[in-house]
């Protein structure tokens, strides 16, 4: 009975949402722009030939660009207008967020100056995006020229044509940012996040197909179809377990109770307002940092195919070697501690608590509060940082052990982004539904009050002919009667008879 009632309530909410014109338009705008982004992402630029063999294409691009293809929306794999994608904008956002702390006082002042300061920082971020986009587009062109398997080639490799590709890819970055802004303002959810999520979801079917074909050759058997089915079933089960584990970690928080000065201990700690600190407070940013640092020597070595440095990098710094994977894990753990501290900012929290007359029960305001929050954050990171590192290196470990291609969309990094984006989209839809319900309720109440007032005005409408002083509006006034001199021949009034 309870399940039936809950289903009916859910159905009623969905029907109410679909009847709301503004909400339906927002969803339609979001879906249309995401579809437009995906269509442009699969159309190669003119003058570029791409091999039909996806494995050769993946081998022709380094792991660094595989990650940035994931972050950029998936346009790099087809060398489309969105080949660079929105990953330069994400890099610029991360750098501006780091510099907006106490590292650069003017930026820190802007970050603390309200909405106007945030708009200026956003404008600066757009300018910082430009060099990142140009450098990444140039690196893509250089790697295509130096690739060994010919998965991608230019029909005309002249300097002017390559400069045209760099300008076009850079322009595609800003077009992607523009589409994301429209989704954020006119649609549902965060536009940039949804574009990244669309790229990950678009790559999932191809990733599953590739893994199904590859896993069939891992174990030699008389029945390859059965072997492929069993191996892929185990792989898909592991994928679901990893998905559930990441969802659990992303939604796990450490709650620090907060109390207002002057209020007695009326409620217990479990009922007090609290400060939530996520188990994975840094998100996927440490993975991006570590990948960027690891990619620098790899990318430089790609430009010098015959040098000894290239073989050293491939033997020790590549993410396909145990040494490279170990170094990658260490960098992720270090950046997780570093970025989570910047993200939470215990010093700023302690200062805000002091200004708003709030405190943590049992902890003195000020420096002790800062130390307490830092201590809690460090304890959380001892769990969250290794978990994030293990999740990030899963595709590389699978590739190293089973000798299968690296598919980051099916790996930990792609799942982390997918889970975070899906949870953010769910919160946005729920917020939109709540806002829609309140707007409809307010509109109904306003219409009801207006109708009641109109009815009361009609029922209690005064006789304007008796409004001698014009207090009820402009109308014909009735002049007050003046005393006339009585004529002795006039008849007496009734009142005068008494």
Curated annotation (Swiss-Prot):
<keyword id="KW-1133">Transmembrane helix</keyword>
<feature type="compositionally biased region" description="Basic and acidic residues">
    <location>
        <begin position="478"/>
        <end position="488"/>
    </location>
</feature>
<comment type="similarity">
    <text>Belongs to the SecY/SEC61-alpha family.</text>
</comment>
<dbReference type="InterPro" id="IPR030659">
    <property type="entry name" value="SecY_CS"/>
</dbReference>
<keyword id="KW-0653">Protein transport</keyword>
<dbReference type="GO" id="GO:0043952">
    <property type="term" value="P:protein transport by the Sec complex"/>
</dbReference>
<comment type="function">
    <text>The central subunit of the protein translocation channel SecYEG. Consists of two halves formed by TMs 1-5 and 6-10. These two domains form a lateral gate at the front which open onto the bilayer between TMs 2 and 7, and are clamped together by SecE at the back. The channel is closed by both a pore ring composed of hydrophobic SecY resides and a short helix (helix 2A) on the extracellular side of the membrane which forms a plug. The plug probably moves laterally to allow the channel to open. The ring and the pore may move independently.</text>
</comment>
<dbReference type="GO" id="GO:0006605">
    <property type="term" value="P:protein targeting"/>
</dbReference>
<dbReference type="InterPro" id="IPR026593">
    <property type="entry name" value="SecY"/>
</dbReference>
<keyword id="KW-0811">Translocation</keyword>
<dbReference type="Pfam" id="PF00344">
    <property type="entry name" value="SecY"/>
</dbReference>
<keyword id="KW-0812">Transmembrane</keyword>
<feature type="transmembrane region" description="Helical">
    <location>
        <begin position="406"/>
        <end position="426"/>
    </location>
</feature>
<feature type="transmembrane region" description="Helical">
    <location>
        <begin position="281"/>
        <end position="301"/>
    </location>
</feature>
<dbReference type="GO" id="GO:0065002">
    <property type="term" value="P:intracellular protein transmembrane transport"/>
</dbReference>
<feature type="transmembrane region" description="Helical">
    <location>
        <begin position="124"/>
        <end position="144"/>
    </location>
</feature>
<dbReference type="InterPro" id="IPR023201">
    <property type="entry name" value="SecY_dom_sf"/>
</dbReference>
<protein>
    <recommendedName>
        <fullName>Protein translocase subunit SecY</fullName>
    </recommendedName>
</protein>
<feature type="transmembrane region" description="Helical">
    <location>
        <begin position="229"/>
        <end position="249"/>
    </location>
</feature>
<keyword id="KW-0472">Membrane</keyword>
<keyword id="KW-1003">Cell membrane</keyword>
<feature type="transmembrane region" description="Helical">
    <location>
        <begin position="163"/>
        <end position="183"/>
    </location>
</feature>
<comment type="subunit">
    <text>Component of the Sec protein translocase complex. Heterotrimer consisting of SecY, SecE and SecG subunits. The heterotrimers can form oligomers, although 1 heterotrimer is thought to be able to translocate proteins. Interacts with the ribosome. Interacts with SecDF, and other proteins may be involved. Interacts with SecA.</text>
</comment>
<feature type="transmembrane region" description="Helical">
    <location>
        <begin position="191"/>
        <end position="211"/>
    </location>
</feature>
<feature type="region of interest" description="Disordered">
    <location>
        <begin position="478"/>
        <end position="498"/>
    </location>
</feature>
<feature type="transmembrane region" description="Helical">
    <location>
        <begin position="322"/>
        <end position="342"/>
    </location>
</feature>
<feature type="transmembrane region" description="Helical">
    <location>
        <begin position="382"/>
        <end position="402"/>
    </location>
</feature>
<feature type="transmembrane region" description="Helical">
    <location>
        <begin position="65"/>
        <end position="87"/>
    </location>
</feature>
<feature type="transmembrane region" description="Helical">
    <location>
        <begin position="23"/>
        <end position="43"/>
    </location>
</feature>
<keyword id="KW-0813">Transport</keyword>
<dbReference type="GO" id="GO:0005886">
    <property type="term" value="C:plasma membrane"/>
</dbReference>
<dbReference type="InterPro" id="IPR002208">
    <property type="entry name" value="SecY/SEC61-alpha"/>
</dbReference>
């Amino acid at each position: 009975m309870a399940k039936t009632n809950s289903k009916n309530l859910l159905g009623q909410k969905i029907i109410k949402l679909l009847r709301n014109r503004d909400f339906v338009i927002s969803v339609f705008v979001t879906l249309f722009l995401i579809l437009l982004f995906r269509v442009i992402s699969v159309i190669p630029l003119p003058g570029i030939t791409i091999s039909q063999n996806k494995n050769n294409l993946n081998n022709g691009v380094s792991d660094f660009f595989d990650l940035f293809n994931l972050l950029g929306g998936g346009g790099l794999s087809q060398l489309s207008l969105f080949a660079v994608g929105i990953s330069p904008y994400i890099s610029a956002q991360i750098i501006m967020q780091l510099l907006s702390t106490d590292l650069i006082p003017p930026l820190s002042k802007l970050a603390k100056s309200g909405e106007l300061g945030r708009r200026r920082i956003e404008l600066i971020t757009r300018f910082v995006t430009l060099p990142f986009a140009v450098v990444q587009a140039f690196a893509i062109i250089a790697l295509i020229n130096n690739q060994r398997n010919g998965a991608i080639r230019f029909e005309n490799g002249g300097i002017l044509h390559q400069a045209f590709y760099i300008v076009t890819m850079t322009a595609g970055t800003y077009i992607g940012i523009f589409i994301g802004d429209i989704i954020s303002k006119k649609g549902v959810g965060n536009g940039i996040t949804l574009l990244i999520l669309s790229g990950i979801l678009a790559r999932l079917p191809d990733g599953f197909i590739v893994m199904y074909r590859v896993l069939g050759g891992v174990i030699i058997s008389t029945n390859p179809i059965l072997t492929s089915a069993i191996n892929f079933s185990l792989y898909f089960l592991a994928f679901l377990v990893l998905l559930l584990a990441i969802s659990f970690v992303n939604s796990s928080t450490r709650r620090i109770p907060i109390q207002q000065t002057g209020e007695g201990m009326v409620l217990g700690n479990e009922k007090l307002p609290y400060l939530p600190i996520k188990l994975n407070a840094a998100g996927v940013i440490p993975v991006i940092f570590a990948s960027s640092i690891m990619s620098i020597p790899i990318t430089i070595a790609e430009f010098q195919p015959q040098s000894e440095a290239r073989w050293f990098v491939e033997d020790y710094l590549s993410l396909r070697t145990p040494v490279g994977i170990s170094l990658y894990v260490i960098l992720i753990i270090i950046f997780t501690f570093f970025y989570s501290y910047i993200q939470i900012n215990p010093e700023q929290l302690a200062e805000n608590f002091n200004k708003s007359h709030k405190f943590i029960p049992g902890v003195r305001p000020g420096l002790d509060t800062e130390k307490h929050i830092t201590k809690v954050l460090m304890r959380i990171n001892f769990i969250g940082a290794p978990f994030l590192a293990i999740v990030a290196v899963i595709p590389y470990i699978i590739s190293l052990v089973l000798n299968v291609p690296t598919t980051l969309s099916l790996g930990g990094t792609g799942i982390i982004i997918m889970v975070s984006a899906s949870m953010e989209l769910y919160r946005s839809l729920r917020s939109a539904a709540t806002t829609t319900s309140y707007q409809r309720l307010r509109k109904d109440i306003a219409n009801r009050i207006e109708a009641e007032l109109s009815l009361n005005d009609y029922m209690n409408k005064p006789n304007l002919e008796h409004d001698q002083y014009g207090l009820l509006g402009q109308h014909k006034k009735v002049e007050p009667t003046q005393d006339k001199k009585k004529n002795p021949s006039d008849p007496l009034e009734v009142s005068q008879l008494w």
